[in-house]
Each structure stands twice: as structure tokens, then as C-alpha cells.
Amino acid sequence: MTADLDIRQVTTADAGELLTLRRAAFVTEAQHYGDPNIPPLTQTLDELVADLQREDVVTLGGWHGPRLVGSIRVLIEDKKATLGRFAVAPDLQGQGFGTRLLLAILPYLPDGIEEVWVFTGRDSVQNIALYAKHGYEHQHDQTAGDLTYAFLRKSLVETPDVHEDDR
């Protein structure tokens, strides 16, 4: 059973706490891939504040009591949404907070969004499994420098069932 989680939009007043959460959460990814220069670890407070003020970005946070324990960011582009900077405090991972945030972002998407994309390190097996469990399907891999990313997609468009008799 997941403990109480208050999910709401992150504001610029939360930026310092969000920056701390992301750095704590992404340091294990950086260590796993041997790259301390991944964007969640190099983003400055000023850059984060500017990102939180963007009209095409929604960032949700999950608070357990007074503590920010998770966050998820989505960039809106036409009919596509791209998830990113998905983080849960390392000491609370595996307790359902990430799943709740992943599901909570969908109602914040504007009408007309047809697909949601996410990318993660190809070797991040737990991340890929979480996304797959919630309907995200692997589409392709892409290499950037020494890292290879897996890109996953979830369609939000209802497709009619095709029956053998209809062909």
C-alpha cells in the first residue's frame, strides 16, 4: 500500500527543493552510465525556474507530508507530449510513488494530445519495465555520444478493434 502522496503542479517557489530531489534521484543513473554530466545533474536553479515558467511544460510534484519525494515533467508539442525528468527520492523508490506520478500526469495533458513519449537509458531495465507496465511500447534506440537511449511511446488515441471478419 502506497503512503499518502499529495500530487500538484510544481511552482517556482518549489524550485530549490525540486533541484535537490532531481540531483539525488539522477545521481544513480549517472553512476550507472559513468556520465556525471546528464542534464538533470547540470541544470542550474535559474534554468529550472525558467523551465517551470514555460507555457509548454507541466511539472508535477508528489509531496509525502512536507517533503517533495517525486516529480515528473512533460513537454507539450502539437499532438505529442514528452515525459522527462521523472524522479523519485532514492530512499522511497519501489513504493509506488513513481507509478502514481506517471498516472497523474495524463489528466494534465491538453485536449488533442495523441501520444506520449519517454526516453531512458537503454540499460535502465527498471525504468523500461515501469513504462511498459503502463502501456508504453519500445519504438527505437538512439545513441548520443557514449549513451544509448530507449524511446517508448504510448498512444492515447482509441483504435477500433479489427476483427478477422472485417478484413
Predicted features and spans:
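Conserved acetyl-CoA-binding loop-helix of GNAT-fold acetyltransferases
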Residues: 88, 94-107, 129-133
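Terminal substrate-recognition subdomain of acyl/acetyltransferases
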Residues: 119, 148-167
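Conserved active-site alpha-helix within GNAT-family acetyltransferase domains
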Residues: 99-100, 122-140, 145
